[in-house]
UniProtKB/Swiss-Prot annotation:
Induction: The mdtABC operon is transcriptionally activated by BaeR. PANTHER family: MULTIDRUG RESISTANCE PROTEIN MDTB, PTHR32063. The lineage of its organism: Bacteria, Pseudomonadati, Pseudomonadota, Gammaproteobacteria, Enterobacterales. This is Multidrug resistance protein MdtB. InterPro entries: AcrB_DN_DC_subdom, Acrflvin-R, Multidrug-R_MdtB. It comes from Escherichia coli O139:H28 (strain E24377A / ETEC). It is a multi-pass membrane protein. Its main location: membrane. One of its GO terms (cellular component) is plasma membrane. The chain crosses the membrane at residues 16-36, 347-367, 369-389, 396-416, 440-460, 472-492, 537-557, 863-883, 888-908, 911-931, 968-988, 998-1018.
Length: 1040
C-alpha cells in the first residue's frame, strides 16, 4: 500500500473520511438534535432582555402635585436612594398619583432588586400619610418587552362599573392563568364603588358638617375580628351585621339625631352605585371600554401564549352576558409572525442563492449537492445549541443565520474546490480527499477562529444593546463552528464517495461555456495582477487612499441608533390647555378619535383620559393607534403619522404627538416623542427660568421636530389662605380645614366593602352639580369648639394662583424632560450635536445639568464605544492570526484588506440613504471577518509554495492568487448573496434587517475588487521588510 505524504494523510479529517457510516450517523444526530431544538425554541421579536426596572405607584386621591411630592414621593425617594445597584431613579408626582421608576444595573438580579424595593417601602411606611388609601404598590417593568396583546371589553347595556367588576374577577383572572402570561393590567378606571354625594346646603341647614358624615359612615361599616365562644361541648364563631353592601343600605344609615328624629344619609346626600374614580376613562374606537394589556412571562413563547389567549376568548365570551363584547385591539404576534416569516423566507432565499452560485462555479451536480447538504446541516445544528443557551427564534438570531449562510458555505467550498483540483489532476477520489482535506485543514481552522474572534467584542458590548446582540453573536459563532466541523468531516467524506474524474469531466454546453468564461476571467486577472506587481507603489497609494477615505466617510456619514420599525402600532399623546377638566379632555379626545378613525390605514384606536399613574394630568390623553397589516395599507408608518398629524391639526385646542411603537424600547417612561433630553436643577424656580429659553431655541432648530416639554406650570390653583388667628379662636385647626376640603372635593375613599370575590370602596364628595367651580368652596362648613357651624369663607380667603400640574424628579432633584423627533432629512447624530451646540450658547448656570435619556443616551453610549469595538475586533483577529501563523507580519497583511470593506459599506449606506446605526455597525464588524478570507487563502498557498516548492515570494503569491481566484470569487459571492435578501427585504421588520444587508453587500463588492490586487502587493512589501529586518539583525550580531 502506498504511503501518503503528511499532507495526504488527511489530518483530522482522515478518521471521518475512512469511516463514512459513523460520519453519516454523527451528522444525522446533529440534524435530529437541531430539528428537536427548533421545535422547542420560543419565538419572539427580539432576544430576551431582562431589564431590571421596577415601578412604584402610590395613589392618594385628591392630593395636589405639591402634596404628593413632599408627603409621598420624597420619603420614598430617600429610602430608595440608599439601595445598592440603583442606576437611576426618576419620579413623577401629579394630582393624586406618585410614580417612581427605579432602574437598576443590568448585573443585578431582578429578584434581589425586588427585595430591596420592598424593604425600602417598609422602612418608609411610617413617614407616609396616615390616611393613604392603599400602600405603595411596586411592579416589574420591562421597557424592552411591551404588551403582547391589548383587549377591549365593551357593553351596550351594562354600566362600565359592572363590566369592570366582571373583567377583573372573571376575565382577567382566567387570562392570567394561561401558561406564558405574566401580567394582566386593566385601564379605564371604572371600579365599582358606592358614591356618597353630600348636599352642602342640606347638611348646613341641619347644622352638620362633612366630617360628621364621614365619621358616621366609617363607624357604621367595619369588618373586623369578633372572636368565638368555646363551650364544654361546642364552639361558636361570632358574626354580626357590621357590613353594609349596597347603596340602599347606606341611604338608610342614621348619621345624627335632631330633636329626637333620625337624620339618614339619604336625607342629605345622593347615594348611588358608581365608579371609584369618576375622572378616569378609556375608549375603544368610539365606545367607552375596559382595556386589558397582557404581558408575557420572561422567556415564554410569545406566539403560543397569544394563540392560547385567542383560543380561550370564545369560551370567555360565552360566559359573559350577551351585551358584553371582547375585542382584540392589537396583537404583537401578528407582526412578529410576519417578521419572522419574512426573515425565514430570506434565509431560505439566501440558501438557494448560495447553492446556485456554487453550481455556477463548480458546474457539477454532485459537487453542488455536498455544500447543499453542509449549509442547512450547519444552520439546523445551531438550533440545538440555541436551546441549551436559552435563546429564542427572533429577528436577530434569524438574521445571524441568514448571514451565516454565506459564511458556512465558504468552508465547504474551499474543501471541495481543493479536493476537486486533485481529482482533475488524476488522483483517485479517496486519495484526493485525504490530500486535499489535509492540505486545507489549517486554512479552515484559520478562517473559522479568525472569524469567531471578530465576534468576541460583540459579547462585551455594554448596556441593553450588548445584551441584545449577545444572542446574535453567539448564534453566528456557533453556526460558523459547526460549519468548520462539517467541512472537515462530512464534506471530505462525501467528496471521496461522490466525486470522480468522470463526473468532474462530464460537461454540457453550459459547463463548457462557463469554463471558458472563467478561464478568460482568470487569464485577465493574471495579466492585471502582473501589471500591479510591477507598479507596487501605485497600488499601495490606492490602499492608503481607501484608508483615508474610510475615515472621512466615517466622520461625515449620518449616524443613528436603531432603525425606526413599522410594527403597525402608533403611540400618541394628546395635549390640551393646562386648565382642562376631565369632561373637557374627554370631549376633545372624542373629536380627535373621529378624525383618526377616518384614516384608511387605521384599524382601531384605544384612548385613555385621567390621572392613572401613566397619564400625569387631566389635560393629557394617551392613544394607541393600531394600523392595518402592512399588505393592507399603502403607506408606511411614518407617512401615516404625518397624515394623521396634519388632520388633527384642524381640531382646535389640542396638540398631538405621535411615534411608532418599537420592538426595542429603552425608555422607562411614556414619552411624547422618540427622543428625550433633560434639564435638572436644585429648584423648580431655576427650571422655570431656563426651560422656556431653551425650548425657544430648540424649536427653531431644523434638526428637530415636535419639540415639547413636560414643564406645565400654569395649572389653576385655588389657594385657601386661612386666617390662623381667627381659626384658632374658633377652635378650628388646619387639619379640620384640610379634612373638610378633602371630604368635599377629593373623591375621598372613606370605607371598604368586603365581599367573597372582591373589595369595593365608599367614596365621599360634595355634589357640585349646582355649584360649579370656585363657588363650591362657599358651601364648605366647619365645626367650631362650641359645636357651632362656621363657613370656611369666614376664616379664609380664596386666591387664584398658578402651580405645576406635575413635579418630576431625577435622582431626587427637580427635572424637566424635553422631547423631540428627528425630521427625515436629518439623523439622530445631527440632532444631538445641534442640541449640544445650542446648550453651549445659553451659558447655563452651574446648578443646572443636562443629560440625554432613553434611546438618545443609549445612542451616545453606543456611538462612543463603536470605534473601540471595531478596534477590539481588529486586535482580537490580529492576536488569533498571529498565534495561528506564528508571525507578527502576516496578520498585518491579512488585516490590510479591512479599509476597502469599510469604504464599500459606508458608500453603500450613503447611496441608499441609510444611517450608520447599530445594525450597520454590526455589519461592518462582520465584514472585518469576511474580507480577510481572501487574504488568508492567498497567503496560505503562497507560504506553502515558498516552503514546499522553493518558489520566490513573487512567484508564490502570483501562483496563489491564480489558484485561489475561483474559491475566493465563490466565497465572496456566496457571502454577498447571503446578505442580498436582507438588503432587498421589504416585509415586516425590513427596517431592522436592511442596513445589515446594505453594508455587507457594499463592503463585499468593493473589497472583492480591490483586495485581489492590493493583498499580493502588501504581502511582497512585508516580505521585503522582513528580509531587511533580518539582515539588519544579522549585521548587528556580526559586528558584536
Amino acid at each position: 500500500m502506498q504511503v501518503l505524504p503528511p499532507s495526504s494523510t488527511g489530518g483530522p479529517s482522515r478518521l471521518f473520511i475512512m469511516r463514512p457510516v459513523a460520519t453519516t450517523l454523527l451528522m444525522v444526530a446533529i440534524l435530529l438534535a437541531g430539528i428537536i431544538g427548533y421545535r422547542a425554541l420560543p419565538v419572539s421579536a427580539l432576544p430576551e432582555v431582562d431589564y431590571p426596572t421596577i415601578q412604584v405607584v402610590t395613589l392618594y386621591p385628591g392630593a395636589s402635585p405639591d402634596v404628593m411630592t413632599s408627603a409621598v414621593t420624597a420619603p420614598l425617594e430617600r429610602q430608595f436612594g440608599q439601595m445598592s445597584g440603583l442606576k437611576q431613579m426618576s419620579s413623577q408626582s401629579s394630582g393624586g398619583a406618585s410614580v417612581i421608576t427605579l432602574q437598576f444595573q443590568l448585573t443585578l438580579p431582578l429578584d434581589v432588586a425586588e427585595q430591596e424595593v420592598q424593604a425600602a417601602i417598609n422602612a418608609a411606611t411610617n413617614l407616609l400619610p396616615s390616611d393613604l388609601p392603599n400602600p405603595p404598590v411596586y411592579s416589574k417593568v420591562n421597557p424592552a418587552d411591551p404588551p403582547i396583546m391589548t383587549l377591549a371589553v365593551t357593553s351596550t347595556a351594562m354600566p362600565m362599573t359592572q363590566v369592570e367588576d366582571m373583567v377583573e374577577t372573571r376575565v382577567a383572572q382566567k387570562i392570567s392563568q394561561i401558561s406564558g402570561v405574566g401580567l394582566v393590567t386593566l385601564s379605564g378606571g371604572q371600579r365599582p364603588a358606592v358614591r356618597v354625594k353630600l348636599n352642602a346646603q342640606a347638611i348646613a341647614a341641619l347644622g352638620l358638617t362633612s366630617e360628621t358624615v364621614r365619621t358616621a359612615i366609617t363607624g357604621a361599616n367595619v369588618n373586623s375580628a369578633k372572636g368565638s365562644l368555646d363551650g364544654p361541648s361546642r364552639a361558636v364563631t361570632l358574626s354580626a351585621n357590621d357590613q353594609m353592601q349596597s347603596a340602599e343600605e347606606y341611604r338608610q344609615l342614621i348619621i345624627a339625631y335632631q330633636n329626637g328624629a333620625p337624620i339618614r344619609l339619604g336625607d342629605v346626600a345622593t347615594v348611588e352605585q358608581g365608579a371609584e374614580n369618576s375622572w378616569l376613562g378609556a375608549w375603544a374606537n368610539k365606545e367607552q371600554a375596559i382595556v386589558m394589556n397582557v404581558q408575557r412571562q420572561p422567556g415564554a413563547n410569545i406566539i403560543s401564549t397569544a394563540d392560547s389567549i385567542r383560543q380561550m376568548l370564545p369560551q370567555l365570551t360565552e360566559s359573559l352576558p350577551k351585551s358584553v363584547k371582547v375585542t382584540v385591539l392589537s396583537d404583537r404576534t401578528t407582526n412578529i409572525r410576519a417578521s419572522v416569516d419574512d426573515t425565514q423566507f430570506e434565509l431560505m432565499m439566501a440558501i438557494a442563492l448560495v447553492v446556485m452560485i456554487i453550481y455556477l462555479f463548480l458546474r457539477n451536480i454532485p459537487a453542488t449537492i455536498i455544500p447543499g447538504v453542509a449549509v442547512p446541516l450547519s444552520l439546523i445544528g445551531t438550533f440545538a445549541v440555541m436551546v441549551f443557551l436559552d435563546f429564542s427564534i427572533n429577528n436577530l438570531t434569524l438574521m445571524a443565520l441568514t448571514i451565516a449562510t454565506g459564511f458556512v458555505v465558504d468552508d465547504a467550498i474551499v474543501v471541495i474546490e481543493n479536493i476537486s483540483r486533485y481529482i482533475e489532476k488524476g488522483e483517485k477520489p479517496l486519495a484526493a480527499a485525504l490530500k486535499g482535506a489535509g492540505e486545507i485543514g489549517f486554512t479552515i481552522i484559520s478562517l473559522t477562529f479568525s472569524l469567531i474572534a471578530v465576534l468576541i467584542p460583540l459579547l462585551f458590548m455594554g448596556d441593553i444593546v450588548g445584551r441584545l446582540f449577545r444572542e446574535f453573536a453567539i448564534t453566528l459563532a456557533v453556526a460558523i463552528l459547526i460549519s468548520a466541523v462539517v467541512s472537515l468531516t462530512l464534506t471530505p467524506m462525501m467528496c471521496a464517495r461522490m466525486l470522480s474524474q468522470e463526473s468532474l469531466r462530464k460537461q454540457n454546453r453550459f459547463s463548457r461555456a462557463s469554463e471558458k468564461m472563467f478561464d478568460r476571467i482568470i487569464a485577465a486577472y493574471g495579466r492585471g495582477l502582473a501589471k500591479v506587481l510591477n507598479h507596487p507603489w501605485l497600488t499601495l497609494s490606492v490602499a492608503l487612499s481607501t484608508l483615508l477615505l474610510s475615515v472621512l466617510l466615517w466622520v461625515f456619514i449620518p449616524k443613528g441608533f436603531f432603525p425606526v420599525q413599522d410594527n403597525g402600532i402608533i403611540q400618541g399623546t394628546l395635549q390640551a390647555p393646562q386648565s382642562s377638566s376631565f369632561a373637557n379632555m374627554a370631549q376633545r379626545q372624542r373629536q380627535v378619535a373621529d378624525v383618526i378613525l377616518q384614516d384608511p390605514a387605521v384599524q382601531s384606536l384605544t384612548s385613555f383620559v385621567g390621572v392613572d399613574g401613566t397619564n400625569p394630568s387631566l389635560n393629557s390623553a394617551r392613544l394607541q393607534i393600531n394600523l392595518k397589516p402592512l399588505d393592507e395599507r399603502d403607506d408606511r408608518v411614518q407617512k401615516v403619522i404625518a397624515r394623521l398629524q396634519t388632520a388633527v391639526d384642524k381640531v382646535p385646542g389640542v396638540d398631538l404627538f405621535l411615534q411608532p411603537t418599537q420592538d426595542l424600547t429603552i425608555d422607562t417612561q411614556v414619552s411624547r416623542t422618540q427622543y428625550q433630553f433633560t434639564l435638572q436643577a436644585t429648584s423648580l424656580d431655576a427650571l422655570s427660568t431656563w426651560v422656556p429659553q431653551l425650548m425657544e431655541k430648540l424649536q427653531q432648530l431644523p434638526q428637530l421636530s415636535d419639540v415639547s416639554s413636560d414643564w406645565q406650570d400654569k395649572g389653576l390653583v385655588a389657594y385657601v389662605n386661612v386666617d390662623r388667628d381667627s381659626a384658632s379662636r374658633l377652635g378650628i385647626s388646619m387639619a379640620d380645614v384640610d379634612n373638610a376640603l378633602y371630604n368635599a372635593f377629593g373623591q375621598r375613599l372613606i370605607s371598604t366593602i368586603y365581599t367573597q370575590a372582591n373589595q369595593y370602596r365608599v367614596v365621599l364628595e360634595h355634589n357640585t352639580e349646582n355649584t360649579p367651580g370656585l363657588a363650591a368652596l362657599d358651601t364648605i362648613r366647619l365645626t367650631s369648639s362650641d359645636g357651632g357651624v362656621v363657613p370656611l369663607s369666614s376664616i379664609a380667603k380664596i386666591e387664584q394662583r398658578f402651580a405645576p400640574l406635575s413635579i418630576n424628579h431625577l435622582d431626587q432633584f427637580p427635572v424637566t424632560t424635553i422631547s423631540f423627533n428627528v425630521p427625515d432629512n436629518y439623523s439622530l447624530g445631527d440632532a444631538v450635536q445641534a442640541i449640544m451646540d445650542t446648550e453651549k450658547t445659553l451659558n447655563l448656570p452651574v446648578d443646572i445639568t443636562t443629560q440625554f435619556q432613553g434611546s438618545t443616551l443609549a445612542f451616545q453610549s453606543a456611538l462612543g464605544s463603536t470605534v473601540w469595538l471595531i478596534v477590539a475586533a481588529v486586535v482580537a483577529m490580529y492576536i488569533v492570526l498571529g498565534i495561528l501563523y506564528e508571525s507578527f507580519i502576516h496578520p498585518i497583511t491579512i488585516l490590510s484588506t479591512l479599509p476597502t470593506a469599510g469604504v464599500g459599506a459606508l458608500l453603500a449606506l450613503m447611496i441608499a440613504g441609510s444611517e450608520l446605526d447599530v445594525i450597520a455597525i454590526i455589519g461592518i464588524i462582520l465584514l472585518i471577518g469576511i474580507v480577510k478570507k481572501n487574504a488568508i487563502m492567498m497567503i496560505d498557498f503562497a507560504l506553502a509554495a515558498e516552503r514546499e516548492q522553493g518558489m520566490s515570494p513573487r512567484d508564490a503569491i502570483y501562483q496563489a492568487c491564480l489558484l485561489r481566484f475561483r474559491p475566493i470569487l465563490m466565497t465572496t459571492l456566496a457571502a454577498l448573496l447571503g446578505a442580498l435578501p436582507l438588503m432587498l427585504s421589504t416585509g415586516v421588520g425590513a427596517e431592522l434587517r436592511r442596513p445589515l444587508g446594505i453594508g455587507m453587500v457594499g463592503g463585499l463588492i468593493v473589497s472583492q475588487v480591490l483586495t485581489l490586487f492590493t493583498t499580493p502587493v502588501i504581502y511582497l512589501l512585508f516580505d521585503r521588510l522582513a528580509l531587511w529586518t533580518k539582515s539588519r539583525f544579522a549585521r548587528h550580531e556580526e559586528e558584536a
